[in-house]
Amino acid sequence: MHAEFRTDRGRIRHHNEDNGGVFENKDNQPIVIVADGMGGHRAGDVASEMAVRLLSDAWKETTALLTAEEIETWLQKTIQEVNKEIVLYSESEMDLNGMGTTLVAAIMAQSQVVIANVGDSRGYLLQNHVLRQLTEDHSLVHELLRTGEISKEDAMNHPRKNILLRALGVEGKVEVDTFVVPFQTSDTLLLCSDGLTNMVPETEMEEILKSKRTLSEKADVFITKANSYGGEDNITVLLVERDLTQKGRDAS
């Protein structure tokens, strides 16, 4: 597996409240994670850092999970535990009350990948030269779009675009979506925060992923492109291919 992680403050925000990285368990099986924090006074930074640290620390203590079913069970259970820890910590510190974070994570299982998500950080897969979104945004605007109350054009500039219906750290229990999809040698997995998807159209994202650039160059281009369109939020990108082997690493 070859992975490239990038995170950038963007052109407007003073702090980077995104977090993420690539982490391995005891059998060198990787998990890839992106989290986008929310809350004032750097609380979002605390929430996203906690989510990534707690989930990756739990993963580092496991041995290889070989089936998609095992991985789904582990993700559901562990993300609930992570959520409870964030809630408890936010309740213990006045400055952190109301903090929360999105989360999207992926674990490889033989010829498949298992993805878990909460919030509006997304997972995409480029397969057979076609980019498709795997995750569903847990946001007010997505719900209005899904029910036909607004158009796709309305959604792009909706005043309540940042309202989430699900996030880690908000309530004692959180609903986690999980997906199992085929992941072949020629495929590319993209995990990202909304600082990318709110800035760069999916048609351009697809063209970048289909290009002849290296995976590292593609990750850099995503950051540059989002900033060139305004860089209104923190931008985080994690790209994964399975045809190369690279030692896992973490970043924040």
From Swiss-Prot:
Basic and acidic residues bias spans: 1-18
Membrane topology term: Peripheral membrane protein
Catalytic function, reaction form: O-phospho-L-seryl-[protein] + H2O = L-seryl-[protein] + phosphate; O-phospho-L-threonyl-[protein] + H2O = L-threonyl-[protein] + phosphate
Organism: Listeria monocytogenes serotype 4b (strain F2365)
Top-level class of the enzyme under EC nomenclature: hydrolase
MF annotations from Gene Ontology: metal ion binding; protein serine/threonine phosphatase activity
Domain of life, per lineage: Bacteria
Cofactors named for this entry: Mn(2+)
Localization per record: Cytoplasm; Membrane
Gene: stp
Pfam family, one: PP2C_2
Role played: Protein phosphatase that dephosphorylates EF-Tu.
Coiled coil start-end: none
Protein name: Serine/threonine phosphatase stp
Residue stretches making up the PPM-type phosphatase domain: 2-242
GO cellular component, one term: membrane
Keywords: Cytoplasm, Hydrolase, Manganese, Membrane, Metal-binding, Protein phosphatase
Cofactor note: Binds 2 manganese ions per subunit.
